[in-house]
Each structure stands twice: as C-alpha cells, then as structure tokens.
UniProtKB/Swiss-Prot annotation:
GO cellular component: cytosolic large ribosomal subunit
UniProt keyword list: Ribonucleoprotein, Ribosomal protein, RNA-binding, rRNA-binding
SMART domains attached to this UniProt entry: Ribosomal_L14
Name this polypeptide is given: Large ribosomal subunit protein uL14
Domain of life: Bacteria
Entry's Gene Ontology BP terms: translation
Pfam family, one: Ribosomal_L14
Subunit structure: Part of the 50S ribosomal subunit. Forms a cluster with proteins L3 and L19. In the 70S ribosome, L14 and L19 interact and together make contacts with the 16S rRNA in bridges B5 and B8.
Organism ancestry: Bacteria, Thermotogati, Thermotogota, Thermotogae, Thermotogales
Amino acid sequence: MIQNESYLNVADNSGAKKLRVIRVMGGFHKKYGTVGDIVVCSVRDVVPNTGIKKGEVVKAVIVRTKKPVRRPDGTYIRFDDNAAVLIDKFNEPRGTRVFGPVAREIREKGYMKIISLAPEVL
C-alpha cells in the first residue's frame, strides 16, 4: 500500500538507492499503489558515479510491498520491505540486474523483462 510521500528501496543496479513517491499512476483519484503499479518518484539517495542524480524524477514499478497482497486462490503474499524497479519510457528496466524476490503479479501486468532478471519469483 504505497501512497504519496512513501519511501521505496530500489531493487536494481540502476544507481539509485532510495525513492520518494510523488504520484501513483492510473487514474485521477488513485490513492494507493500495490505490486505491479507504476509510480512517479524522486530519487533521494544514489550510488556515486552513476547515471542517476539525486532529485531526478523517474518512473518505477512496485515489485515488493509490506502490505499483504491477496491472490485469487485466497493466499496472501507479503515482503520485508517496499521496493521498486526503475523503468524507462518504454516500460523496460533501466538496470541490468534485479535484487531480491519479486511477486508473481509483475508477470500478470506484463513486465516480462523484470521477471527474467529477477533471481526469484514468488
């Protein structure tokens, strides 16, 4: 359950480490984002000497949330942190690696490149 001003960890090697959500995409009054949603973020913490600058506005896909996500079979999945993967204007990941597990809902939303880079899909 990600909303405006939420902080996210970055789960890829794009160069950013922390993001702050500016807006959850997908509708005029959409308040909360969950796994698979696109968010517009400001970069708050970066790795030195990378292509990403602090304060840069980027788009990202949420891949993990602490809030449990209910699946159609009645099971729930939750993670230890809130994390996202940075994407470009073609919805492809900006990094070349993804760290940590990602939820299966990412595949259903059509982010196959992120699924192929992830070490584990839960």
